[in-house]
Amino acid sequence: FGLDSDNVIRIGGWSAATNRFQMDMAGNLTMAGNITAYSDIRLKENIKVIPDALSKVQQLRGVTFTRNDTEDLEKLHTGVIAQEVEAVLPEAVSEDNDGIKNVAYGNMVGLLIESIKELKAEVDNLKTQLENK
């Protein structure tokens, strides 16, 4: 574990081949494993399916953008806009002490799963209608 001369924090070794975790000054996080979150049903209460998921997804935009707060101003990124997510799924958005909004992308997975299920139901309904003609 340590801070290397190139300002990279590493755990597990001093090269990409032996690193288990690496965070650089640009804010990039690389690891050998997965990012996980507790999801055990024993830790959850008041479980409800997300209603109208497809209509919520339709209110979001998948966008490309460049950032104005990094050294690499030309690098193209993809993602969503926190304020737009907050309007339809506020539990996926937080705000830091400086008022900068953050998106917990993992918290959007449930919404996407339910919207796919809604689309599947629509497709199945259309198939049935076509078969019955």
Identify the role of each PLM range.
Residues 19-105, 119-133:
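C-terminal intramolecular chaperone/autoprocessing and neck/assembly modules of extracellular spikes
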Residues 1-15:
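Flexible "stalk/tail and boundary" regions
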